[in-house]
Amino acid sequence: MKRINIVFVALLALICVAPAGAQEKHKWLEYVRPSGSLQGGVSFDPQEMDYQFYVRRARVAVLGTVLNNPRYGKLEYVVRASLVQSPSLLDGFIKYTLRDEFGVQFGQFRSPVNLENTELSSTTIELIDYSLVTQRFCHLGSLDLEGINASGRDIGINFYGKFLKMSDGHHLIRYDVGIFNGAGINRRDDDQRKHYMARLMVYPLKELSIVGYYSRVLGPHPDIAPEYNVYDWYVYDRYGGGVYYKSKYGWFRGEYMEGHTHGYLARGAYATLGYFILPELDASARYDYFVTDTSRPSSTTQHLITVGARWKPLSFFYAQLNYTCNFAPSSVQPTHLVNLQTSLVF
């Protein structure tokens, strides 16, 4: 905790110092760019006639480009902290891109398990919540199947790149290959397991991406005593794919994932459809389903239907209004939730 507090104080100091000196502003912003976000709102349960206010996220970050040279490549860093409940480090990594075809990222950052986890941040995703697939399979929040709840992040190293530049400037192929501790954030590796990930994204059009991914944890099973020198080198895996199309008129995104967790096979999918009504106003709808244990589908299947609108009158402020109908396996009747969330981004 002492280290986290030091990081938090350092972030605030950099944010305060960075704007100083008008003549040095552009130089500062190249090496040290402060940013942050604050998200909160109110949720209402019409069945219980109950509502509650909440602060969901409060984050500050410092990022910058240390090197940007056509010959020697590009070196970037990001340090991001969460201030909700107690200060904690979310992101802390360096990213070196030697050329388009090869780069390496090292530290604590969002792991490339699927599409939604890395391509959409908490301030750019169209609806308030991530899909069930992302929450349960990608260590994102309290619904995580493994109970790690690491905000979709992990500590490790990732190699990435893109190939075959097209006439309109986009690249046809993009890849990620990484090795992670698999223990979550702000923690040393507490076992001998490692999380291996691979993801391939193909862009037939600039607006269209098709993705496939596979990840697997290898190492001794925690339930097997190491003194017997007996290892179960297959603990769990994740695999799936998806598609994402976005144009000036709207977007469509869908993914399917499945995988084993401690002997149980789970699977899920989602589909999101959205339309830009005005430049500052859009509407979207999403269908989710998730089966926690495919051997007991009738008692472990959950369906969600979410519709929402997002209004962004200012570049640094937007509001989201969502309605969710939840068909949970433990409920005889579906539950309903109305959620209004506002966001400040700087």
PLM segments and residue spans:
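Bacterial N-terminal signal peptides that target proteins for export
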Residues: 1-8
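Bacterial N-terminal signal peptides
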Residues: 9-16
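Sec/Tat signal peptide C-region and signal peptidase I cleavage site
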Residues: 18-22
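Outer membrane beta-barrel
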Residues: 24-181, 192-194, 201-209, 272-275, ...
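Solvent-exposed loop/turn segments connecting transmembrane beta-strands
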Residues: 46-52, 79-89, 117, 185-192, ...
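Detector for outer-membrane/organellar transmembrane beta-barrel domains
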Residues: 201-294
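Outer membrane beta-barrel transmembrane domains
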Residues: 274, 280-320
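Outer-membrane beta-barrel "beta-signal"
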Residues: 311, 334-346
